[in-house]
Amino acid sequence: MSGHSGHDVKYGRHRTRRSFARISEVLELPNLIEIQTASYQWFLDEGLREMFRDISPIEDFAGNLSLEFIDYDLGEPKYSVEESKNRDANYAAPLRVKLRLINKETGEVKDQEVFMGDFPLMTEMGTFIINGAERVIVSQLVRSPGVYFNGKLDKNGKKGFGSTVIPNRGAWLEYETDAKDVVHVRIDRTRKLPVTVLLRALGFGSDQEIIDLIGDNDYLRNTLEKDNTDNAEKALLEIYERLRPGEPPTVDNARSLLVSRFFDPKRYDLASVGRYKINKKLHLKNRLFNQTLAETLVDPETGEIIASKGDILDRRNLDQIIPNLENGVGFRTLRPTDGVMEDSVLVQSIKIYAPNDDEKEINIIGNAYIEENVKHITPSDIISSISYFFNLLHGVGDTDDIDHLGNRRLRSVGELLQNQFRIGLSRMERVVRERMSIQDMTTITPQQLINIRPVVASIKEFFGSSQLSQFMDQTNPLGELTHKRRLSALGPGGLTRERAGYEVRDVHYSHYGRMCPIETPEGPNIGLINSLSSFAKVNKFGFIETPYRRVDPETNRVTDKIDYLTADEEDNYVVAQANSKLDEQGTFTEEEVMARFRSENLAVEKERIDYMDVSPKQVVSVATACIPFLENDDSNRALMGANMQRQAVPLMHPEAPFVGTGMEHVSAKDSGAAVTAKHDGIVEHVEAREIWVRRVSLVDGKEVTGGIDKYTLRKFVRSNQGTCYNQRPNVAEGDRVVKGEILGNGPSMDSGELALGRNVLVAFMTWDGYNYEDAIIMSERLVKDDVYTSIHIEEFESEARDTKLGPEEMTRDIPNVGEDALRDLDERGIIRVGAEVKDNDLLVGKVTPKGVTELTAEERLLHAIFGEKAREVRDTSLRVPHGGGGIVLDVKIFTREAGDELPPGVNQLVRVYIVQKRKIHEGDKMAGRHGNKGVISRILPEEDMPFMPDGTPVDIMLNPLGVPSRMNIGQVLELHLGMAARALGIHVATPVFDGANEEDVWSTVEEAGMARDAKTVLYDGRSGEAFDNRISVGVMYMIKLAHMVDDKLHARSTGPYSLVTQQPLGGKAQFGGQRFGEMEVWALEAYGAAYTLQEILTIKSDDVVGRVKTYEAIVKGESVPEPGVPESFKVLIKELQSLGMDVKMLSADEEEIEMRDMDDDDFTNQNDAFNIVQPENAATEKTE
């Protein structure tokens, strides 16, 4: 090992890397898709049960019948994962629920098991299979339910406060101050009332009661003056008028309305997280910290004095009295009269002196520790939140920052599903109630009451069309993994792009170790869609936690005890960085340590440290942690680097990077694209499609062999993005494998590591200006040797339907098609597997009946003799679209007869898969891992590329001007280290924030026998002369991105037109034209190019008659006729006429031009070659 820095680390079975890490990892990375699998598991184990418990029992309006949910179980899924994909089905299991119907009059009890629909299951990879496609449910970041206080300035610059009590579902309660120092309340976003009205309605009727409760102060006096009610009943009526304007109020109605709005668990739900947050916020300790007591605290049981009047409660004193507070110090039982609640209310109240005036006493009230299982709001919550608001006005208590991750929580799959299921169940509940009152009570069974349609529909709607249920990004394993770890602030119940301001999107200090500050999309969603950090976990309340190493307070040593902290908890501690220097015992070597406290970065005495980071990469996400030398890149470019790695196309021959970060192995293993061993064992048999492993387990110290596990590998399957999904074995017969080890490489993997691109020889130099503006010049060797060749699989389908005129049929017998076009079709008219097809070739022959007139006797005779040919049919065959040519990989046929489930009206469905081998091409987009992207501008023959002194030509030339202004120097360090690694025949790992420094790079370069500045003389391949200066040449990892020129190239001569304006459609998918827009018209006007302009605006666009005649004229070789009136002009005139204006069109000699109607003969004649629109891409404009 001597002679170089770094040490060897083994990643998986086949790869060893020299790691430059200096910090040893204390904690293994967690399973990276746990956020999906754990949440779904919770839903199956507890979420479903919780929901049935909430809704059960359902009683009829009279209370005679009651339906209870007893138990449920999920059966076996109908199809396996593979089969669900092939059949376009859902991977789902039947949910059966055991119900009990109790007739209270007769005491009769009926039990029955009822089927409640098929419930989609999650695969082991954390995905769902819906209609045969893999989908991912993205976790949603929402505001946590709870009570929030925030400062606000009014228009005169006067400081005030606002406060909101936000439930999980139910009515909001908001408090605010106005310019006259009156405190108002809004119930459920209605008009505001003085806050004392709400207190009176709760049963504190007189002014004196309110003053005794809250404590005397100016704000309260102002509010009481503004309040024109003087007892509980008037207050109730006042509230009722606000909530139900226009209805005649009665006291009873008002009382029951308020009760149902806030104190009914079915209408108002805080969820356990809301109860937890409210108890935490309204606890007295936050407001007592550093305040002076204005009364003596006595233990109610023993009578001993805990703290005396005038004591200042610093942290130590406060910690001592907290247990006493929880035992009932300062508890007061209030007995409200005439209010909403009959019961007494328990609160906890303590008097302190105002911080700015030690004569004045303030009363602080807490909600007296309500049990976790009370999910609705209680009167004591309302009283304490009002008290907190008044305390804030006197400078006691804190306001909240809503962008802090302690106030934002995650709704993962399980909870999103639960909420959706609950909607379905509550719809079902209504139906059940109605049926209970209609049907005969004696004969009724649970089965007859239940209607599962709403439940099934709500689940289907969620998976099929929710904003959070997304088509999985399967471009490569990293894209797949990142998609499952994505956090979105959008979606139902979240933000919208337009409403989200700058603050929500910005990086917040509480994101540290929880959400990646780098990986987020560019564009309108920036900062709203984030990625989970590498070590983060989600706790039971949905808050993101990050691990820290605990520091022993006695010895000040860093222990290996790991605590997971939420953002709230972390706010109380001082946390040291992961790179702080420690000695063998785990003590800090320096007296002052760099540490974080809330949003500050400070140098702190080592005794004050509470925790220490686990790893330098705990800040960033998985994709960001795959960028070597991240610490040398500007963050904007790192963002592009992280995002572009997800768009890497899997290559035919992937190759792991020489310069990695050590994350390649973990991310490949956890992505779900690899085949991993489920048990320890010995490999018995390996072939391309299957691996057999004999299980081996230890029993009493002896090895015992068990059964065989068979692992099937997926070969050449189309991924969601049309890339090729292919798995290859990574083990040999006789290998011993352990549980979790990679048996087979997935796409973009090499030896069990992520391999998104290839290592190529790069020179930073210009070459005749061909790499201007980030363009890339490439050697032809990369094309010849298939270095950047990728495989793409496209799927085309054709269906035979029943039409009004008879069924369509698939056949070889197609009108007006020669035998040579049919040579690769079988007798059913379907292409054979292995055929090579070009644009516009037939894939599936299909004919559709035309409108059949009454046949004459002769026609019937012909029909009887010649069969199909004579019948009126039109050719609606499936043909290869432009740019879709390739080799037919597979054909799948689904028919009604064979028992396949097809949509209504479809008799037969044929899917054809065409595979293309795409070599790299001018116009393709490539990138490095540092956000250095570019388009290939020229592919030079090998002999023209500059070559090194030993004759090796370089592979790629990049423009050196792309580096300084972008400040992504990481690519230059990677280039040099990669060159040295290749020369030494090693792979290196340089983890983020803890990798090779400049000195390490130069010493490795010298070890490889290269010049210390790592530059070399290059010779011009054309002339053989040396270039004037030495040039940086090295090995860089370059990726081919999914933006390929073959997918973007598009040309049109004639094609479909929009129905209203008759202008050509736009976009490649619609086979549209190029829009010659307003500004382009100005350009031609500026040149006075009148004729060109005229034909662009008329016959090339929407002069319906003119374009047909022009087409004919061109075909027959005649001169082009005069253009007519454009259709869009007619549309304009019709619109003006529809507004009641009399608009006419006059010719030059002032004759009125008759506007011919839309259904002009020339235009409707469907037979002219020009206006035929294929029904598949019928002229409907797609709005993107």
From Swiss-Prot:
Gene Ontology molecular function: any one: ribonucleoside binding
Q: Which UniProt keywords apply?
A: DNA-directed RNA polymerase, Nucleotidyltransferase, Transcription, Transferase
The broad enzyme category this protein falls into is: transferase
Q: Read off the Pfam families from this record.
A: RNA_pol_Rpb2_1, RNA_pol_Rpb2_2, RNA_pol_Rpb2_3, RNA_pol_Rpb2_45, RNA_pol_Rpb2_6, RNA_pol_Rpb2_7
Give the protein family: Belongs to the RNA polymerase beta chain family.
This chain's function reads: DNA-dependent RNA polymerase catalyzes the transcription of DNA into RNA using the four ribonucleoside triphosphates as substrates.
Task: Write down what this protein is called.
Answer: DNA-directed RNA polymerase subunit beta
Q: Which organism is it from?
A: Listeria innocua serovar 6a (strain ATCC BAA-680 / CLIP 11262)
The lineage is:
Bacteria, Bacillati, Bacillota, Bacilli, Bacillales
- The protein's gene is named rpoB
